[in-house]
A protein has these predicted regions:
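Fold-level signature of zinc-dependent metallopeptidase catalytic domains
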Residues: 123-180
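Beta-strand-enriched, solvent-exposed domains that form extended recognition/catalytic surfaces
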Residues: 1-124
Length: 180
């Protein structure tokens, strides 16, 4: 399963904060299966998940956010804003401590936030099993342990143009297959 954690990054060029918005459970985990506690890439933010009882790191990932990019703009010197950010983590089997850290370009901590997630918490929303957005597989090369899915969104198409969208999406898949 997957734990979706929704945060709101807020602030301006002088001061930043992180707030927890919502937790959701999704039916399957399609992320990496090995080296979960190692950082695959350096970003300007990190999420660290630790077993609550042992404090051992069980998952770590990095990211770069639009909020941190926005902080470098002139607008951020004059006004504060909030940006929504969602992260997908392996669903914990035991209670965990989740820490999220935002870094400056000089790798100084700008903001951090810690919270505990208990897997049996009734406030964690179960999603992805009902009210699933209609979708079609245009090309399916294997299961999520072997392959990744690429989503093609119908942005810009009207409801009446869905047949055209699916035709264009199929053409894009065929073009991609010929490149591989």
């Amino acid at each position: 399963k997957t734990l979706r954690v929704d945060y709101i990054f807020t602030g301006d060029a002088r001061q930043q904060a992180i707030y927890l918005d919502e937790l959701s459970q999704l039916p399957s985990w399609a992320g990496r299966q090995h080296h979960l506690s190692e950082l695959p890439l350096e970003g300007n933010g990190q999420i660290i998940v630790k077993d609550l009882a042992t404090k051992r790191c069980i998952y770590k990932t990095s990211f770069s956010s639009l909020f941190q990019e926005w902080l470098t703009t002139d607008e951020a010197k004059e006004t504060a804003k909030g940006f929504e950010n969602s992260f997908l983590l392996p669903y914990p089997k035991q209670p965990v401590e989740v820490e999220i850290v935002l870094y400056s370009p000089r790798r100084e901590v700008m903001a951090n936030y810690k919270h505990i997630v208990r897997p049996d918490d009734i406030l964690i929303h179960k999603r992805g099993v009902s009210h699933v957005t209609p979708h079609r597989y245009m090309l399916q090369s294997g299961n999520e342990k072997e392959c990744i899915d690429v989503a093609i969104l119908a942005e810009g198409y009207t409801g009446k143009e869905m047949d055209l969208f699916y035709q264009d999406a199929q053409n894009a898949c065929e073009d991609r297959k010929s490149v591989v």
